[in-house]
């Protein structure tokens, strides 16, 4: 597999206001540490020096986060107004995200909704991790929903695994990793929430990839679909043997459903933004003072006030 480098930056969407890049695995988005030789911020500065904004700390406005170990679609706003419009889509839960993953074992149910509440793990030595409600040391668990669809069964380095599509309907820290682990099907290569097994106890990466992203802002519909990295031609350790659901059909479902417009209650200017078949996306709760303060802090360096 091609290693990450400053020159190796894949752009999958570009407009006047936004970029969507296909982040490499094991690359941080940004870092204040001088020893961090490779970050997405440095890749962007190398590729698009003219787009860097000296008024922001990192030069670029990242609309959301991806874990260090996770690859895939990540959106960058190119001006403060675009950053604000993207934030409002995230706040109103109008963003559609879908991930691909290889998980341990053969998942038997072809579709399921995972609904374990997730909270912070206060157990000594695990304070930077999350856990499901009922786990000893689980603090302030919050409702969490993930849709899972099984795509393929196969083997990874000789061990049974399943390739799945995951759609988070809420946005908890490490939600997909925690939910898969709670099912007994941890993500291959997840050394925090998974279990080392046999010959594959040190995989070259965590097998979680942000595959699809849609942000229906009022000005444009930012939509990107990244290449599937979990195919035998790219990773000889992965050997699928049973197809359960074609990925292309699920992408069509994601793209075809109407996008709800919260201001009018009807279809918005972009589509879609609805989950895969299942119980549906929970309605967004009213914005709290804490959330509003977080928004103001998030936007402060761009001097943009959120709508009242």
Curated annotation (Swiss-Prot):
Region annotated Disordered, chain positions: 257-292
Modified residues (N-acetylmethionine): 1
GO terms of molecular function: pseudouridine synthase activity; RNA binding
Biological process according to GO: enzyme-directed rRNA pseudouridine synthesis
Ranges of Pro residues composition bias in the record: 269-287
Annotated catalytic residues: 67
Highest rank taxon of the organism: Eukaryota
Classification via Gene3D superfamilies: Pseudouridine synthase (3.30.2350.10)
Keywords: Acetylation
InterPro entries registered for this protein in UniProt: PsdUridine_synth_cat_dom_sf (IPR020103), PsdUridine_synth_RsuA/RluA (IPR006145), RluA_PseudoU_synthase (IPR050188)
Keyword Calcium tagged: no
Listed PANTHER family: MITOCHONDRIAL RNA PSEUDOURIDINE SYNTHASE, RNA PSEUDOURIDYLATE SYNTHASE DOMAIN-CONTAINING PROTEIN 1
Family named by the database record: Belongs to the pseudouridine synthase RluA family.
Name recorded for this polypeptide: RNA pseudouridylate synthase domain-containing protein 1
